[in-house]
Each structure stands twice: as C-alpha cells, then as structure tokens.
Amino acid sequence: MTDSANPTPSARPPRQPRTGTTGTGARKAGSKSGRSRAREFALQALYQHLVGGNDATAIDVFTRDLSGFHKADAAHYDALLHGCITTAQYMDELIAPQLDRKMSEISPIEHAVMWIGVYEFQHCQDVPWRVVINECIELAKEFGGTDGHKYVNGVLNGLAPQLRATEVAADKAAARG
C-alpha cells in the first residue's frame, strides 16, 4: 500500500486543468471572440424561434437587451439570426438527408446549431470549414444535450464536402501529403 503523502515514482501527476475552459471543455466567457459570442446569442434567438415561433424582430429586440450582448459581433449576430430564419426551409432540406431520425425529433438546440453551421458554410467563406464545425461543436457542448455535440459534428461533417467542396478537398489532399 502506498502512502498518499509519498506516492510511488510511477504515480501519474495530477491532471492539470485547461486554462480558459469550463469543466465541459467549453471556453470560458472571457476568452470568447465577438463572433463566438454572436453565435451564442444567435443560438438563443433561434431557439426562441424554433420553440416559440416568435417573430425575428421581437426576438432580436429581446436578445439585444441581454447581458453581455455588447461584447458580441452584432453584424455577425444579425446575419445569423435573420439569415437562418429566412433560409430555414432550405437549410432543413440540406440537413434532412444527414439525419437518422425525423427533424421533429431533433432537439431545438441541436437544430439551431446545425442551422448556424450550414449558414456559415454557405455565407461566411472567411471562416474555415473546420472552424465552423468546431464552433458548432462548442455551442452544442455548452447548450445542448449530453451527446448532442457528436450528432452536430456528424451532420456538419457530412455536409462540409457538399457546401465547401473545394476547401474540404484541398484539406484532404494536403493531409495525404
């Protein structure tokens, strides 16, 4: 038996916490970019739209009054909120073939996160496709169900070659060497 005050030499050192993250691995609020914050507020607004059927203008007014909105990239938030609501049916048609269940069975959080991912794939060409997926995974980890981030990852990885074909192909070619 080993003494806890004198561990054996082979004992592993205590795990060091990742700085700038929460217990779930999500980034802490202080280390988030304006665009990351915009995605969070857009997610909350899109959730209101999906669950309550609220009008985009009413949601927008409510969301802009939330604490911390001033730190978000307002232009990116506007693009996500209004763009996702305007193109929701089209985005659902893109997402549906990637699903293993009916859209109505998808959590509204994961649904909204997938909308954000699809919208950014199509309209935010300055954001690399892997960053889009990573940001959406982080949103799903922070706000979604236990394994929702895995589902979001699978769906967006399935859509990336379709929506960002050139960029994905170039990344895969570079990885092969």
Curated annotation (Swiss-Prot):
Keywords: RNA-binding, Transcription, Transcription antitermination, Transcription regulation
Region Disordered, annotated ranges: 1-35
A GO MF label: RNA binding
A Gene Ontology term for the protein's cellular component: cytosol
SUPFAM superfamilies on file: NusB-like
Stored InterPro entries: NusB-like_sf (IPR035926), NusB_fam (IPR011605), NusB_RsmB_TIM44 (IPR006027)
Compositional bias annotation for Low complexity: 17-28
GO biological process, one term: transcription antitermination
HAMAP family: NusB (MF_00073)
Purpose: Involved in transcription antitermination. Required for transcription of ribosomal RNA (rRNA) genes. Binds specifically to the boxA antiterminator sequence of the ribosomal RNA (rrn) operons.
Family according to the record: Belongs to the NusB family.
The name this protein goes by in its record: Transcription antitermination protein NusB
Gene coding for it: nusB
